Amino acid sequence: MNKFEVEILSPEGIVFKGATPSVSFPTTRGIITVLSGHINLITKLNSGEIIIEATDGTKKIIVSGGFIEIVNNNVNVVAEFAAHSDEISRQKIKQAIDHAKDMKNKRKEFVNMYAIESQLKKSAVDLKSGLEIKRKKI
């Protein structure tokens, strides 16, 4: 069977890099299996398990969100969290939970920053309008 290159990255670094005849991914539209010669595709990676058929056996990688890019017989995965299933421990699970909480807080901060920025712009317009009205009265 023909092989193709797969690289899986997480914030911690490269989780897997190598050639394989087959890899299956959890996506937001279900499980997709990629074989050599697959069409070019970019799709969202869902939480779940990536299954890689390797020469030394099946490898399973647990992932939590991200993106998959398939271009010219190369598969690149960027995951928010990724680890070999046999490496999963309480510590890794705690890290994933902490990361999710951190992302949630950052999103709240972003929304709050957006609200603050909008309020500042509105206040600047109000101030400018008020100064123009005051000048006209003088």
From Swiss-Prot:
Family named by the database record: Belongs to the ATPase epsilon chain family.
InterPro entries: ATP_synth_F1_dsu/esu, ATP_synth_F1_dsu/esu_N, ATPsynth_dsu/esu_N
Keyword Transport: yes
Biological role: Produces ATP from ADP in the presence of a proton gradient across the membrane.
Name under which the protein is recorded: ATP synthase epsilon chain
Domain of life: Bacteria
UniProt-recorded Gene Ontology molecular function terms: ATP binding; proton-transporting ATP synthase activity, rotational mechanism
Membrane disposition: Peripheral membrane protein
Summary of subunit composition and partner proteins: F-type ATPases have 2 components, CF(1) - the catalytic core - and CF(0) - the membrane proton channel. CF(1) has five subunits: alpha(3), beta(3), gamma(1), delta(1), epsilon(1). CF(0) has three main subunits: a, b and c.
Subcellular location(s) of the protein: Cell inner membrane
GO cellular component: plasma membrane; proton-transporting ATP synthase complex
Keywords, ordered alphabetically: ATP synthesis, Cell inner membrane, Cell membrane, CF(1), Hydrogen ion transport, Ion transport, Membrane, Transport
Entry-linked NCBIfam families: ATP_synt_epsi (TIGR01216)
UniProt keyword Ion transport present: yes
Main location, first listed in the record: membrane
Gene: atpC
